[in-house]
């Protein structure tokens, strides 16, 4: 049985992830890898090397990629998966997870999150603090739902999109890949073109 977790990324997001891992009480030891050589300890946990050193620990640890940038997180996680490393999901004990919910590998579900029945969440997603996903949502791989965001029922968010803090998505709305939705924005109809969207209701600004 593997009792060690290695978290790639020791900055802010990594610290939150480490706190979740501790509260899950699944691993006896937790350590970080980070390419910033100036970081030696984070959350009282040792930084034991750089990202490339993950392969040294392939057979003795589970892995989690705690990088906030969606594209970089995808690149690193897919590299680990391709090389056969065991990437896990992390779910805070305070999260409320409904029946028939799927959470993909490498996804973090933070404190206070509510995920309702029959929702599907892909690989490498961030479901951030106190966000809510209602019934029958589909979040594709490497999506980030920021703190306090609210998704109504039957919402679909395509790969790699990011919903800003406090954003709201109405029911039955589809958001295409490559979108950034700004803080406090309200999405009331489908977004079909990649870009940055802000406002109430949202408008495209680039």
Task: Report each predicted region and the residues it spans.
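Phosphate-bearing ligand-interacting subdomains
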Residues: 38-96
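Short phosphate-engaging motifs
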Residues: 13, 72, 187
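Residues at the starts of beta-strands that form the adenosine-phosphate
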Residues: 4, 28-30, 62, 86-87
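Glycine-rich adenosine-cofactor-binding loop
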Residues: 3-21
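Structural signal for interior beta-strand "rungs" in well-ordered beta-sheet cores
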Residues: 89-205
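Short amphipathic alpha-helical segments
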Residues: 18-20, 75-79, 121-122, 192-193
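NAD(P)-binding Rossmann-fold cofactor-contacting core
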Residues: 24-41
């Amino acid at each position: 049985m593997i009792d060690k977790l290695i978290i790639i990324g020791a900055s802010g997001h990594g610290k939150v992830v480490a706190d979740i891992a501790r509260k899950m009480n699944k691993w006896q030891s937790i350590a970080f890898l980070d390419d910033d050589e100036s970081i030696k300890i984070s959350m009282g946990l040792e930084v034991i090397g750089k990202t490339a050193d993950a392969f040294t620990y392939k057979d003795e640890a589970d892995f989690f990629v705690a990088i906030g940038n969606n594209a970089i997180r995808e690149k690193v996680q897919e590299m680990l998966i391709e090389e056969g490393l065991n990437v896990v999901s992390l779910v805070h004990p305070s999260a409320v997870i409904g029946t028939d919910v799927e959470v993909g590998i490498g996804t973090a579900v933070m404190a206070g999150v509510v995920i309702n029945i029959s929702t599907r969440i892909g690989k490498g997603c961030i479901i951030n603090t106190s966000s809510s996903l209602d019934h029958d949502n589909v979040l594709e791989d490497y999506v980030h739902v920021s703190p306090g965001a609210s998704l109504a029922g039957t919402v679909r968010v395509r790969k790699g999109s990011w919903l800003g803090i406090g954003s709201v998505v109405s029911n039955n709305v589809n958001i295409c890949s490559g979108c950034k939705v700004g803080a406090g924005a309200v999405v009331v109809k489908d977004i079909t073109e990649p870009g940055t969207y802000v406002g109430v209701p949202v408008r495209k600004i680039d």
